[in-house]
Structures are given as C-alpha cells and as structure tokens.
C-alpha cells in the first residue's frame, strides 16, 4: 500500500447518538462516527482533547474533539495526532468546542505558547482533507488554529468569536472605559 492506493471502505453501522451543542468531546465524536468504529489514541494524555481513528460512512478518518480550555498537553496531543493523520493522508475531522487556551503563567512556562504555535502550524501545513465542525464554543486564537480547515460547519446554537469576551470589550469600548471614573461600573 502507498499514497496512490485507493483507500479501503469498511462495513459500518450508523451512529445512534445525537450531536448536541456543548457535548463532551468523546460523546460529540460518537454522534458523528460509525458505531463502534473508534480507536482512541493517546487516551492518558491531554484529557480535554479526544483523538481517535474511526470511520464515517465506512471511510477512515482521524477525529480531534476538544472540550473546555486547552492546556499545553492537550494542544500537543492534537498537534501530534494531526501530523500522524497528515503523514498517511487520513482526513481529519476536528470538533471544536473550547473556550480557548488555558490562561496561566504556569502553562505558558510549561510550553503552552510554543505548543499553540505548533498546533496552528500543523493545521496550516497539513495537506490532508480537513473538516472543522463547530459544536459549542470556538473562542479566540484556538478557533483560528483548530478551524483552519478546508470545510467549516457550525451546529445551531454554537458561539464563534475571534476574540475572548474580555478582550473584545476592551477593544470595542475602549473610549467609554477610559472616560469612566469607575471602570467596574462601565
């Protein structure tokens, strides 16, 4: 087998779960992939990211599903998995439901910024087919990194924002905040 070989199509059973906004990563993936087809990868590492090889309609895919805030371990796990899928031309389905990267100095010192940059570069450099499904919150730079896909789909009720709410307020209402004597009341 090589990269010119036609991919195998497997027998499959339709999923029985229903995708809902803000579902846990594994449950969100289970609603989209063929029943009992998932083989989870790196299960003990980066708990807020679910990575698995699975089938959708009998076709092999790599699934990355996010939840909550992403620490440096979660980001490294997703990046490593997408690079693996890209190396073997396995299409990647990314289910985005995250409030962003963990905003902590300790996470930054542990490599959070480096891993976030690596994740963005991995998605940008990947030549395999990439589909992003926004299934909850997609806020800030993590949206830009994870939704760098060939196709983006949003579930009804999801939230997409290029800026975190606090950053958006400070940008959009800067004049009002500067003019106010009581910033908390503004």
Map each language-model feature to its residues.
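Ligand-binding clefts of soluble mixed alpha/beta catalytic domains
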Residues: 1-186
């Amino acid at each position: 087998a090589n990269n010119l070989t036609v991919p195998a199509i497997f027998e499959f059973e339709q999923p029985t779960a229903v995708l809902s906004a803000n579902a846990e990563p594994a449950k969100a993936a289970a609603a989209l992939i063929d029943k009992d087809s998932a083989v989870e990868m790196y299960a003990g590492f980066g708990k807020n990211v679910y990575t698995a090889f699975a089938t959708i309609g009998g076709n092999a895919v790599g699934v990355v599903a996010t939840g909550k805030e992403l620490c440096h371990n979660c980001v490294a796990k997703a990046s490593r998995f997408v690079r693996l899928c890209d190396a073997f031309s396995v299409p990647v389905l990314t289910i985005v439901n995250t409030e962003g990267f963990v905003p902590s100095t300790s996470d930054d010192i542990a490599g959070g910024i480096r891993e976030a940059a690596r994740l963005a570069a991995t998605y940008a450099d990947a030549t395999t087919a990439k589909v992003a499904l926004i299934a909850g919150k997609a806020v800030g730079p993590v949206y830009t990194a994870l939704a760098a896909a060939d196709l983006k789909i949003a579930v009804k009720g999801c939230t997409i924002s290029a800026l975190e709410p606090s950053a958006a307020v400070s940008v959009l209402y800067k004049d009002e905040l500067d003019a106010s004597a009581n910033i908390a009341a503004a």
